[in-house]
Protein backbone atom coordinates (compact mmCIF):
# COMPACT_ATOMS: atom_id res chain seq x y z
CA UNK A 1 0.00 0.00 0.00
CA UNK A 2 1.49 3.40 -0.96
CA UNK A 3 2.27 5.83 1.82
CA UNK A 4 -0.30 8.53 2.47
CA UNK A 5 0.52 11.91 0.99
CA UNK A 6 2.03 14.46 3.35
CA UNK A 7 -0.67 16.92 4.42
CA UNK A 8 -0.28 20.41 3.02
CA UNK A 9 -1.22 21.79 6.43
CA UNK A 10 -1.32 20.13 9.82
CA UNK A 11 -1.91 21.14 13.42
CA UNK A 12 -0.66 18.91 16.21
CA UNK A 13 -2.12 19.30 19.69
CA UNK A 14 -2.49 23.03 18.99
CA UNK A 15 -3.37 24.84 22.21
CA UNK A 16 -3.69 28.41 23.43
CA UNK A 17 -4.55 29.64 26.90
CA UNK A 18 -5.61 33.12 27.94
CA UNK A 19 -5.02 33.13 31.67
CA UNK A 20 -7.02 30.21 33.00
CA UNK A 21 -9.16 29.91 29.87
CA UNK A 22 -8.21 27.32 27.24
CA UNK A 23 -9.51 28.81 23.98
CA UNK A 24 -8.16 26.05 21.71
CA UNK A 25 -7.49 22.74 23.39
CA UNK A 26 -5.03 20.28 21.78
CA UNK A 27 -6.59 20.37 18.30
CA UNK A 28 -4.94 18.00 15.81
CA UNK A 29 -6.03 18.10 12.16
CA UNK A 30 -4.48 17.39 8.78
CA UNK A 31 -5.56 19.19 5.60
CA UNK A 32 -4.73 17.98 2.08
CA UNK A 33 -4.52 19.57 -1.35
CA UNK A 34 -7.73 19.77 -3.34
CA UNK A 35 -9.99 19.83 -0.28
CA UNK A 36 -12.26 22.42 1.29
CA UNK A 37 -12.77 22.02 5.02
CA UNK A 38 -15.40 24.03 6.87
CA UNK A 39 -14.74 24.79 10.53
CA UNK A 40 -17.99 25.27 12.42
CA UNK A 41 -19.19 25.59 15.99
CA UNK A 42 -21.22 27.81 18.30
CA UNK A 43 -20.30 31.32 19.31
CA UNK A 44 -17.04 31.29 21.28
CA UNK A 45 -16.11 27.76 20.19
CA UNK A 46 -12.60 28.82 19.17
CA UNK A 47 -12.97 28.85 15.39
CA UNK A 48 -11.41 32.24 14.66
CA UNK A 49 -8.81 31.68 17.38
CA UNK A 50 -7.83 28.41 15.68
CA UNK A 51 -7.56 30.31 12.39
CA UNK A 52 -5.38 32.94 14.07
CA UNK A 53 -3.07 30.23 15.39
CA UNK A 54 -2.69 28.72 11.93
CA UNK A 55 -2.06 32.01 10.14
CA UNK A 56 0.27 33.36 12.84
CA UNK A 57 -1.82 36.20 14.26
CA UNK A 58 -1.62 34.41 17.62
CA UNK A 59 1.19 32.39 19.19
CA UNK A 60 0.31 28.95 20.50
CA UNK A 61 0.86 28.05 24.14
CA UNK A 62 1.81 24.56 22.98
CA UNK A 63 1.52 22.31 19.97
CA UNK A 64 2.69 22.80 16.40
CA UNK A 65 1.67 24.02 12.94
CA UNK A 66 3.24 22.25 9.96
CA UNK A 67 3.18 23.34 6.32
CA UNK A 68 4.26 20.76 3.78
CA UNK A 69 5.72 18.74 6.64
CA UNK A 70 7.87 21.62 7.90
CA UNK A 71 7.31 23.03 11.38
CA UNK A 72 6.38 26.71 10.98
CA UNK A 73 5.22 27.27 14.56
CA UNK A 74 8.01 29.76 15.24
CA UNK A 75 7.11 31.93 12.24
CA UNK A 76 4.93 35.01 12.61
CA UNK A 77 2.10 35.99 10.28
CA UNK A 78 4.37 37.55 7.64
CA UNK A 79 6.64 34.52 7.57
CA UNK A 80 3.71 32.17 7.17
CA UNK A 81 2.33 34.27 4.33
CA UNK A 82 5.68 34.00 2.56
CA UNK A 83 5.66 30.24 3.09
CA UNK A 84 2.24 29.86 1.48
CA UNK A 85 -0.66 30.62 3.83
CA UNK A 86 -3.20 33.13 2.52
CA UNK A 87 -5.85 34.59 4.83
CA UNK A 88 -9.00 36.62 4.31
CA UNK A 89 -10.42 38.16 7.47
CA UNK A 90 -13.96 38.87 8.70
CA UNK A 91 -13.11 42.56 8.27
CA UNK A 92 -11.43 43.16 4.92
CA UNK A 93 -7.71 43.86 5.20
CA UNK A 94 -6.85 46.21 2.33
CA UNK A 95 -4.84 49.36 1.61
CA UNK A 96 -7.93 51.61 1.56
CA UNK A 97 -6.27 54.73 0.16
CA UNK A 98 -4.64 52.96 -2.78
CA UNK A 99 -6.32 52.06 -6.07
CA UNK A 100 -7.58 48.52 -6.53
CA UNK A 101 -4.82 47.71 -9.03
CA UNK A 102 -2.13 48.85 -6.58
CA UNK A 103 -3.48 46.59 -3.84
CA UNK A 104 -2.95 43.60 -6.10
CA UNK A 105 0.34 44.85 -7.54
CA UNK A 106 1.84 45.18 -4.07
CA UNK A 107 0.95 41.56 -3.34
CA UNK A 108 2.65 40.43 -6.54
CA UNK A 109 5.70 42.55 -5.78
CA UNK A 110 5.92 41.13 -2.26
CA UNK A 111 5.69 37.60 -3.62
CA UNK A 112 8.39 38.26 -6.22
CA UNK A 113 10.78 39.77 -3.70
CA UNK A 114 10.14 36.92 -1.31
CA UNK A 115 11.08 34.48 -4.06
CA UNK A 116 14.73 35.52 -3.87
CA UNK A 117 16.43 34.12 -6.93
CA UNK A 118 13.18 34.34 -8.89
CA UNK A 119 13.14 38.12 -8.58
CA UNK A 120 15.08 38.42 -11.82
CA UNK A 121 12.08 37.22 -13.82
CA UNK A 122 10.30 40.47 -13.03
CA UNK A 123 11.75 43.04 -15.41
CA UNK A 124 9.66 46.09 -14.55
CA UNK A 125 6.75 47.66 -12.73
CA UNK A 126 4.80 47.07 -15.96
CA UNK A 127 5.06 43.29 -15.48
CA UNK A 128 3.49 43.52 -12.03
CA UNK A 129 0.66 45.70 -13.35
CA UNK A 130 -0.02 43.28 -16.21
CA UNK A 131 -0.30 40.35 -13.83
CA UNK A 132 -2.44 42.35 -11.42
CA UNK A 133 -4.83 43.07 -14.27
CA UNK A 134 -5.16 39.33 -14.94
CA UNK A 135 -6.11 38.65 -11.33
CA UNK A 136 -8.61 41.50 -11.35
CA UNK A 137 -10.18 40.02 -14.48
CA UNK A 138 -10.57 36.68 -12.69
CA UNK A 139 -12.63 38.31 -9.93
CA UNK A 140 -14.47 40.66 -12.33
CA UNK A 141 -12.97 43.88 -10.95
CA UNK A 142 -11.28 45.17 -14.10
CA UNK A 143 -13.77 48.03 -14.43
CA UNK A 144 -12.78 49.46 -11.03
CA UNK A 145 -9.00 48.99 -11.33
CA UNK A 146 -8.31 52.68 -10.63
CA UNK A 147 -10.91 53.12 -7.88
CA UNK A 148 -9.65 53.57 -4.32
CA UNK A 149 -10.20 50.39 -2.33
CA UNK A 150 -12.03 52.37 0.36
CA UNK A 151 -14.68 53.40 -2.17
CA UNK A 152 -15.63 49.86 -3.17
CA UNK A 153 -18.90 48.32 -2.01
CA UNK A 154 -18.48 45.55 0.54
CA UNK A 155 -18.86 42.72 -1.95
CA UNK A 156 -16.17 44.15 -4.22
CA UNK A 157 -13.84 44.54 -1.25
CA UNK A 158 -14.28 40.82 -0.60
CA UNK A 159 -13.48 40.06 -4.24
CA UNK A 160 -10.40 42.28 -4.09
CA UNK A 161 -9.20 40.38 -1.04
CA UNK A 162 -9.53 37.13 -3.00
CA UNK A 163 -7.54 38.65 -5.88
CA UNK A 164 -4.79 39.67 -3.45
CA UNK A 165 -4.64 36.16 -2.02
CA UNK A 166 -4.50 34.67 -5.51
CA UNK A 167 -1.65 37.05 -6.38
CA UNK A 168 0.36 35.73 -3.44
CA UNK A 169 0.00 32.19 -4.88
CA UNK A 170 -0.51 30.47 -1.51
CA UNK A 171 -0.88 26.73 -1.02
CA UNK A 172 -3.51 27.35 1.66
CA UNK A 173 -6.49 29.70 1.37
CA UNK A 174 -8.20 30.64 4.64
CA UNK A 175 -11.61 32.35 4.57
CA UNK A 176 -13.04 33.67 7.84
CA UNK A 177 -16.79 34.15 7.30
CA UNK A 178 -16.44 35.38 3.70
CA UNK A 179 -20.17 36.07 3.36
CA UNK A 180 -20.42 38.22 6.51
CA UNK A 181 -22.10 41.56 5.81
CA UNK A 182 -22.79 40.72 2.17
CA UNK A 183 -26.10 41.30 0.44
CA UNK A 184 -28.17 38.45 -0.98
CA UNK A 185 -26.96 39.40 -4.47
CA UNK A 186 -23.29 39.51 -3.44
CA UNK A 187 -23.10 36.13 -1.69
CA UNK A 188 -23.29 33.95 -4.85
CA UNK A 189 -20.43 35.91 -6.41
CA UNK A 190 -17.97 35.24 -3.59
CA UNK A 191 -19.12 31.61 -3.33
CA UNK A 192 -18.49 31.17 -7.04
CA UNK A 193 -14.92 32.43 -6.59
CA UNK A 194 -14.33 29.94 -3.79
CA UNK A 195 -15.86 27.17 -5.93
CA UNK A 196 -13.40 28.02 -8.71
CA UNK A 197 -10.44 27.88 -6.34
CA UNK A 198 -11.60 24.49 -5.12
CA UNK A 199 -12.17 23.22 -8.67
CA UNK A 200 -8.53 23.97 -9.55
CA UNK A 201 -7.75 20.93 -7.40
CA UNK A 202 -4.33 21.93 -6.10
CA UNK A 203 -5.20 24.26 -3.22
CA UNK A 204 -6.07 23.58 0.39
CA UNK A 205 -9.04 25.68 1.50
CA UNK A 206 -10.22 26.30 5.05
CA UNK A 207 -13.49 28.07 5.73
CA UNK A 208 -15.06 29.43 8.90
CA UNK A 209 -18.72 30.03 8.14
CA UNK A 210 -21.87 30.16 10.26
CA UNK A 211 -24.37 29.76 7.42
CA UNK A 212 -24.97 26.05 7.11
CA UNK A 213 -26.37 26.30 3.59
CA UNK A 214 -23.06 27.85 2.52
CA UNK A 215 -21.11 25.12 4.32
CA UNK A 216 -23.10 22.38 2.65
CA UNK A 217 -22.66 23.93 -0.80
CA UNK A 218 -18.88 24.26 -0.52
CA UNK A 219 -17.36 21.80 1.93
CA UNK A 220 -16.31 18.21 1.39
CA UNK A 221 -15.34 17.98 5.06
CA UNK A 222 -16.57 19.59 8.26
CA UNK A 223 -14.79 19.84 11.58
CA UNK A 224 -16.69 21.02 14.63
CA UNK A 225 -15.16 22.90 17.54
CA UNK A 226 -16.91 23.25 20.90
CA UNK A 227 -15.33 24.90 23.93
CA UNK A 228 -12.03 24.88 22.05
CA UNK A 229 -12.07 21.13 21.46
CA UNK A 230 -12.50 19.13 18.27
CA UNK A 231 -15.76 17.22 18.72
CA UNK A 232 -16.51 16.02 15.17
CA UNK A 233 -14.68 15.56 11.89
CA UNK A 234 -15.97 14.02 8.67
CA UNK A 235 -18.15 14.30 5.59
CA UNK A 236 -20.80 17.03 5.81
CA UNK A 237 -23.90 14.82 5.85
CA UNK A 238 -22.55 12.56 8.57
CA UNK A 239 -21.25 15.41 10.72
CA UNK A 240 -24.45 17.46 10.48
CA UNK A 241 -26.54 14.41 11.41
CA UNK A 242 -24.34 13.52 14.39
CA UNK A 243 -26.13 13.75 17.77
CA UNK A 244 -22.98 15.29 19.24
CA UNK A 245 -23.10 18.08 16.68
CA UNK A 246 -26.85 18.54 17.06
CA UNK A 247 -26.33 19.11 20.77
CA UNK A 248 -23.10 21.12 20.68
CA UNK A 249 -23.68 23.24 17.59
CA UNK A 250 -27.28 23.07 16.46
CA UNK A 251 -28.88 22.78 19.86
CA UNK A 252 -31.01 25.87 19.40
CA UNK A 253 -32.44 24.62 16.10
CA UNK A 254 -35.61 22.54 15.90
CA UNK A 255 -34.84 18.81 16.08
CA UNK A 256 -33.78 17.54 12.67
CA UNK A 257 -33.24 21.05 11.26
CA UNK A 258 -29.57 21.07 10.26
CA UNK A 259 -29.77 23.93 7.80
CA UNK A 260 -30.52 26.77 10.16
CA UNK A 261 -27.90 29.50 10.53
CA UNK A 262 -26.02 29.17 13.81
CA UNK A 263 -24.43 31.82 15.96
CA UNK A 264 -20.96 32.74 14.79
CA UNK A 265 -17.73 33.54 16.57
Show where each model-derived region lies.
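Glycine-rich phosphate-binding loops of nucleotide-dependent enzymes
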Residues: 2-265
Amino acid sequence: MPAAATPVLETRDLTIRFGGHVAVDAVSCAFHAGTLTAIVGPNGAGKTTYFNLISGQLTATSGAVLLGGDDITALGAAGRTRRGIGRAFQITNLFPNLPVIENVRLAIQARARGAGSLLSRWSSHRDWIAEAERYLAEVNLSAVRDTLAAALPHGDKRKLEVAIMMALEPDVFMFDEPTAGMSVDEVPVILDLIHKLKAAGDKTILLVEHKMDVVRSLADRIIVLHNGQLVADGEPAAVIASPVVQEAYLGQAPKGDATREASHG
